[in-house]
Amino acid sequence: KIQVLAKAAKDRSILWKFEKSGRTGYLYGSIHLGKQEWMIPGPKTIAALQASGAVVLELDILDPQVQAQMSDPSRFGIKNIALPQPLKQRMETIAKRVCAPVAALAGLHPVMQLITVTMLDARFSNLEVGYSTEIFLSGFARGAKKTIASLETAELQMRTLLAGDAKDILETIESGMTLFESGKQRVQTERLINAWATGNLEELQRYEQWCECMNTETDRK
């Protein structure tokens, strides 16, 4: 199967090449979801990886320490927030629709609940976290024994996503539920993924104009 995928692999997203002080580097636009047939990058991306001595990721999600830290935001002093009953019921409805384990989901921070149902909903568009470019890049670097580094830390990501005023967080969940209930969430996901896959930089740069995720002051913070 891997050989078939590798033979049919095409370059997707955007790959920049830069040079400084006689050294060459590459910048690649990765994404957190993917399709099985996209799992292996195309020849130009593979060549860039092979020519690189180090692979620097947003966050190395195959690192066991990172995985442990991401699984427990409380270790960073981030407190969980209970959803008001109306929002909780709406979340449960969405969770059942995307086949999420309702009881387990309810124990997560509300933002993680929203992220989880969004990722699970993407499966209906044949998109999976397990086929994301970050997982391939990290696995490739490990297999090739290249240096791996992260630009961010688990704590930074957790604080960026989850820390904040409870009112703002609940407003974010409200906006997310509205997108799901209107049927627009999947449309937006597919539009973003297609823009990434085709390397449509103009569409990606206009993301905030069409994502319907910047409608409130909280969204724009």
Label for each model-derived stretch:
Residues 1-220:
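Structured, acidic catalytic/metal-binding patches in enzyme active sites
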